[in-house]
């Protein structure tokens, strides 16, 4: 039956607020876990590893030298056992902070003192904002709340987030955790979020606020699809795709974000488990990229490469292979159980173990774990009062608003006018959703505001479920009756974790069960505007709704976090002008019917009827394209500055001086001697808001290169989000590096500068640029 709902908060919200108030009045706080408590044990003051005035290297060397082999092995696992004789407590490495402090992993938990933490939108929606400042701001709040929880013994300091895998296939259950399908967006998200988590207020590179971890390295984007399982999947990836699609976010994490950790994945890449591949770990992460931190396995990965993948004949051999490849920390206990046996069998020596635990200890020292009482350190004043603050919760609301994508708006049907809507029908399986809004890898939110509650704060709203998300059985008749009696309808449908999640990929792109029938029949009966809200991580084939004239507006809201209902209402009623853009392609169902999820190739193969993947390589039909979006205003672009010609100066003996070349290596003296002070040039654009209301707008700079080396159809060079008032204009500047930004990856995985005609794209503008020698 339909029911009136003007609830401002749920009962659980009121209870949570009550608990917070009580806990603030309590002086019985738990203590954080830390080493070198010289106040409690003055004898520790003479230990060099407890001397914060020494270099981290000197302290680590001293500590490792004091440990027995058995004690060393205890620090190879995520539940480090500690050494009481040296004043080192046990420590749980595994905490998560994908979009807020989580209680997944055991390293962090919620208690009476801190019963919840701010739950921001799931990453895919935050990425849709294309706002680098927002990415970093969220990371900073999450790390502040984490430190506050650590100070009362409720959290660790090492967080295995973010997930920067490429959202390669629309069926992937974990696509919701990622920044989307584009390497440039994913890289910028990775760097900004990592900096938000890690950077200290003092800016000391040898100190960490918390330690972030970029995962899952590498080419991991399938969980469980038609009996293809991540634990046994061998990702066959050519060097070209590895270099220009799968690796860039991880490289950016390490090189530009200075992340403290990288997690290797379950899958194999070209026949080798990533956690036992010395080329990927020691060669690339620590060698080429110079990781300052530790490499951790996904949980049980070393056990998996032995028991599931049969890459090692014995557990001891599996441990040895992982340590010798460059793995420092094993999530779970496998390496702790079998490392001693590996040493005794001569498969690995103690030096390899010393190297691994040294990286782990160095990270903890940068966090201040070995500096004594954290309450006397930089963030020692943080506590429960700094978690779930009004500002933090407002940022969660604003983050959701900035990410929401308006996909259809017939005849300007949105925003709705509150004064014109006397009765609003709110219908659908996600219309009164709570936990669904916060996706996965979440904690306990400060509070929930459901879509129904958010809308009901503005206009009189009547609710009808229609069906649950699976929508096997539906009460469509009651929903139709309600729609027919209301001035406007908001339908909130889509997915939840039963449809898409870790360990569960989708098999099709249809709305679940009878949801399409529910939407179509409700829209047919409605006598006013019909707003379709899709709550999901991945895209759906909603061609039926796109073409249905009775459905006047469509919005995608991802999983919008604890304040999702408020953000949705802000957009629907015009308090916020939508400015999000899709971070991934929405494909038709026909696409997944002919493309196996297990095919890792990004580029099309016409001879096999393979269409390729992502906007960079796929030219077929889409439901909605990457970066698609509408807004309540209009923005015009005018190109002010960009070169027509870039000349590269080659050495006298360079072979391309005497013969015609299609491309050059993207390294060498010619990369320093191009026009405009090196290999850089600037693109300036004037952007004007020509509409009748203020709004934010993302300016995208794309490029199309000459078709050599299977180069992308187009690729994103950069983006900038700006806010303009009515009739306001501003200049947006992009700095373009020829060798970095205009290069493509060849078939061997090397970067090349394509010579000849390039196109720069901004909106409908196209600018020709020629690169010559």
UniProtKB/Swiss-Prot annotation:
Gene Ontology biological process terms in this record: arabinan catabolic process; xylan catabolic process
One GO term describing the cellular component: extracellular region
Keyword DNA repair tagged: no
InterPro entries named among the record's database cross-references: BXL, Fn3-like, Glyco_hydro_3_C, Glyco_hydro_3_C_sf, Glyco_hydro_3_N, Glyco_hydro_3_N_sf, Glycoside_hydrolase_SF, Ig-like_fold
Alphabetized SUPFAM superfamilies for the sequence: (Trans)glycosidases, Beta-D-glucan exohydrolase, C-terminal domain
Catalyzed chemical reaction(s): Hydrolysis of terminal non-reducing alpha-L-arabinofuranoside residues in alpha-L-arabinosides
UniProt entry tagged with the keyword Secreted: yes
pH dependence: Optimum pH is 4.7.
Cell location: Secreted, Extracellular space, Extracellular matrix
EC number annotated for this UniProt entry: 3.2.1.-, 3.2.1.55
Record note on disruption phenotype: Reduced seeds size and delayed germination.
Span of the signal peptide: 1-23
Pfam families the record matches: Fn3-like, Glyco_hydro_3, Glyco_hydro_3_C
Gene Ontology MF: a single term: xylan 1,4-beta-xylosidase activity
Glycan attachment residues as annotated in the record: 131, 349, 432, 770
Active site: 298
Keyword terms, alphabetized: Extracellular matrix, Glycoprotein, Glycosidase, Hydrolase, Secreted, Signal
Tissue expression pattern: Expressed in flowers and siliques, in the early stage of seed formation and not at seed maturation. Detected exclusively in the endosperm of very young seeds when the embryo is at the globular stage.
Temperature dependence: Optimum temperature is 65 degrees Celsius.
Family as reported in the entry's similarity comment: Belongs to the glycosyl hydrolase 3 family.
Function statement: Involved in the hydrolysis of arabinan. Can hydrolyze (1,3)-alpha-, (1,2)-alpha-linked side group residues and non-reducing terminal L-arabinofuranose residues of debranched (1,5)-alpha-L-arabinan backbone. Also acts as a beta-D-xylosidase, releasing D-xylose from arabinoxylan and xylan.
Protein's name in the database: Beta-D-xylosidase 3
Gene: BXL3
